[in-house]
Design a protein with these regions (language model features):
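N-terminal localization/anchoring segments of enzymes in phospholipid and broader phosphate metabolism
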Residues: 1-313, 318, 322, 362, ...
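C-terminal structural cap/anchor segments
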Residues: 356-410
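Hydrophobic alpha-helical segments and helix-packing faces
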Residues: 320-323, 337-340, 367, 371
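Structural motif
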Residues: 142, 331-332
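Helical hairpin unit composed of two closely spaced alpha helices linked by a short loop
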Residues: 333-354, 359-360, 364
Length: 472
């Protein structure tokens, strides 16, 4: 009997030590690299570490990191003078200054912006940018599929490498697995450097299993940029007749100018992280030059674990409060956090016309179920919700005529708080109007969504999926 009591006390002591270790690990990681978690997520981790330490500690080490970088906060900037009526440059100054305060590169000039009308136009632009490279060609994507479109792009990359151009392909580890394990042998034999960003199994050992590089860009000679929401798979462009010919609507664009050099620097940072090289190993950053007063300006907005702030989220929140007339948004998945949902709702309540366009049915059924609760809240605030009959994969937001954000980030928790994402903030009013026109074209094919009250089972399932939304 005495031995049983001693053994029980030993087990309780050992359990208490394990719990203490788990909580110490949580506090130590949070102190070393502030994670800026939502309070509910922080509470959930603490409760799990206290009640289920043997399960929670390994999970936290594998999936718990959200931020990987800590740096000193930039100096605060002086107040902005009130903008005069019709002063377009001053109207968007808030967004540029916010970006700089978060450590982003300053807005850079660009020219020859092309918004691709459809998948065929986007495919031609991809091949044109690849063909234009004479020195360097950097490609970052989440998916490079083993289909007709993926094979065509891979062949173009091999051809460029054989011409002596330095070609680098950075593909996400999860994306490479989802797309059927790309055959990298022919690419590497042609001279293409191929690196997997955070391979799934190795990432578990590094505590990065929950982080994905969702960025999509092609940079030629650090001067031409192709960017947007399209993965390199047939359905994002013209479809593949052998797979049913399904075509998704998506948004991409290309341009020339100094913004391409900023994109090359961003690719270099991602490449160095994936290859574990020191930053700046191959690329000397282009100097910031004096920008002509009449230049069109845009700013790269990378978001993810390497950024101290949640940059896209911060711009969206500020945009909701700065908007005076309209907010146009298109996204395939809508699972915002409570703060962004409140900002959009408040904008609608004070008379800003808020239009949100989504596909009636996306390629993620669970996300479709989880979105209904925030959609009901937004509709109750006076926003207009639209469902397209086709799969809409575009990601863009327009604030008045001041700002257009376009790129890879969805309006969901994973894109806003976990993934490596890349958006471009356009400040040229004429180009902001062009993005708005693109979104309006998609809206013209949509049907107004009028939400209805859910039953008990649906309400419970929506709540459960929202709780699990980081994994969707």
């Amino acid at each position: 009997m005495t031995l049983d009591i001693v053994f029980e006390r030993y087990l309780l002591t050992l359990h208490a030590i394990v719990v203490a270790i788990g909580l110490i690990v949580y506090v130590a990681v949070a102190r070393a690299l502030p994670q800026r978690r939502d309070p509910s997520a922080a509470i959930a981790w603490v409760v799990a570490l206290a009640l289920l330490p043997y399960v929670a500690i390994p999970l936290y080490l594998m999936f718990g990191s959200r931020k990987l970088l800590m740096r000193d906060a930039p100096a605060l900037l002086p107040p902005i003078a009130p903008a005069a009526a019709g002063d377009d440059e001053a109207a968007s100054l808030w967004a540029r200054r916010l970006g700089r305060s978060m450590g982003l590169a300053p807005a850079a000039p660009y020219e020859a912006l092309r918004l691709h009308a459809d998948g065929a136009d986007a495919r031609r632009a991809v091949l044109e940018v690849i063909a234009a490279a004479t020195r360097t060609l950097d490609v970052c994507t989440f998916i490079l599929a083993r289909d007709r479109l993926g094979d065509e792009i891979a062949a173009a990359l091999r051809a460029k490498a054989e011409q002596g151009v330095r070609v680098r392909l950075l593909i996400d580890g999860i994306g490479a697995w989802l797309s059927g394990r790309l055959d990298v042998g022919p690419l590497r034999r042609s001279g293409v450097e191929v690196v997997t960003f955070v391979p799934p199994f190795r990432s578990i050992l590094r505590g990065r299993a929950n982080l994905r590089n969702h960025r999509k860009m092609i940079v030629a000679d650090a001067a031409r940029l192709w960017c947007g929401g399209r993965n390199f798979a047939a359905e994002y462009f013209e479809g593949d007749p052998e797979r049913g010919g399904v075509v998704w609507h998506d948004l991409s664009f290309d341009l020339h100018g100094e913004l391409g050099a900023r994109a090359a620097e961003q690719f270099e940072e991602d490449w160095n992280y994936a290859t574990r090289r020191s930053s700046g190993a191959h690329l000397v950053p282009a100097p910031y030059r004096i920008v002509p007063p009449d230049a069109s300006l845009a700013q790269l907005v990378p978001s993810g674990p390497e950024q101290v702030d949640d940059t896209v989220q911060a711009l969206l929140l500020s945009g909701c409060f700065m908007a005076q007339r309209r907010i146009l948004a298109v996204t395939p998945y809508f699972i915002p956090d409570a703060t962004l949902l409140m900002a959009l709702s408040l904008a609608a309540r004070r008379g800003v016309q808020v239009d949100l366009i989504l596909p009636r049915r996306s390629n993620h059924r669970l996300a479709d179920v989880a979105r209904h609760r925030p959609l009901r809240d937004l509709a109750a605030a006076g926003a207009r919700l639209w469902f397209t009959p086709f799969m809409l994969h575009a990601k863009a937001i327009v604030i008045d005529d001041q700002l257009a954000l376009a790129g890879s980030a969805n309006l969901d928790l994973r894109s806003l708080f976990l993934n490596y994402e890349l958006m471009v903030a356009f400040y040229e009013p004429a180009d902001v109007v062009r993005f708005a026109a693109w979104i309006e074209r998609e809206r013209s094919a949509a049907v107004r969504y009028e939400p209805s009250e859910p039953g008990l089972v649906r309400d419970l399932s929506e709540g459960l999926l929202l709780w699990l939304a980081f994994q969707l």
